[in-house]
Structure formats: C-alpha cells, structure tokens
Amino acid sequence: MKVFLGLLLGYSTILILTYQSPTTQHPPKEELEYWCTYAKTCDFCWDCQNDTCINKVINESISMNSIVNCRVTRDSQSQSCFYEISLKIPNYHSMECSYPRLYKHFMSMEKWRDENWPILIRHYCFYLVFSFAFAGCVAFAICKNLRLRTTMKLLMLLSILVLLSQPILNN
C-alpha cells in the first residue's frame, strides 16, 4: 500500500511539473514581448545603465525608479499566466494566456508620474477644504436650527462652487 501511494504521489508530482512552468525572473527571450506587453515595468523587460532604462522590446526609455521586480509563471493546464510583482507590498496579476489584459496598477503608476503630482496634490487639498466646508455647513445648520430647505440650499450652493472650480484646478 505504501509503495502504491508513493508511486501515485511521484506520478502526480511529475504531472504537475509538466503542466506548470517554473516561476522565473528571467523568461526566455522569445517570450519577452508577451510578458513585457502586459506588465510594462517588470525588471526583466528593461536594460538599465546610468539611471536610464531602455525597453528590450519596444525601445522606450524610462527612469530606473519605476522598475519593479517581477516573477512570471505560465500554467498550461489552466491556461493562465501569473505575474508576482514585488513592490513594497507584493501584488499579483493573473490572466488567461490567450486573453491577456494589462496590469492596472502599472497604468495608474504611469499616469501619476512626475508632471501630474502638483495637480493631484491641488485636488486633494481642495477636496480636504471642501470636506471641512461641508461639515461646517451642516454644523452651522444644526446650531442655528435652520430648516431643512435652507440647509439644502446652502449645500447646493457649495456643490455648485465645487463644480465651477474644477476647470481652475486642472490648469
């Protein structure tokens, strides 16, 4: 019985190993185009020298600070491709190999890079001030025992001011 269980365990291990490629930080060169298309800032996609990195597939350049360590696995049994992305907090991205999709976290990192930080900070500061104004308006209405209709008018006026100020914030 023990021999039978040992053979069964050994056979299942061989089957698992044939269906799943090992996790690697260095995928084969012929697969680089595939892996680098859907998680663009993985370290194996870039050739870095002197704080400048050039993409091995599309000849694009990027700052060395944007590069993250990645490991990839392809499971041929379930037809899934898996990225393990090591930022400060590990992230994972799984997709069907035949229907790949972009890793959204990288896209948002690219949008917020460099020139967009001042706009982002302005927006957050504005919304913080707006939140205090909104809370102050509600507190004022409660303290003065204003009727609901008057309170709603004050809140609508505050909301209109927020909407009108949006184009100014985006400049």
From Swiss-Prot:
It comes from the Viruses. It holds the Pfam family v110. The chain crosses the membrane at residues 2-20, 123-143, 150-170. One of its GO terms (cellular component) is host cell membrane. Keywords: Host membrane, Membrane, Transmembrane, Transmembrane helix. It is a multi-pass membrane protein. It is found in: Host membrane. Belongs to the asfivirus MGF 110 family. Plays a role in virus cell tropism, and may be required for efficient virus replication in macrophages. This is Protein MGF 110-12L. It comes from African swine fever virus (isolate Tick/Malawi/Lil 20-1/1983).
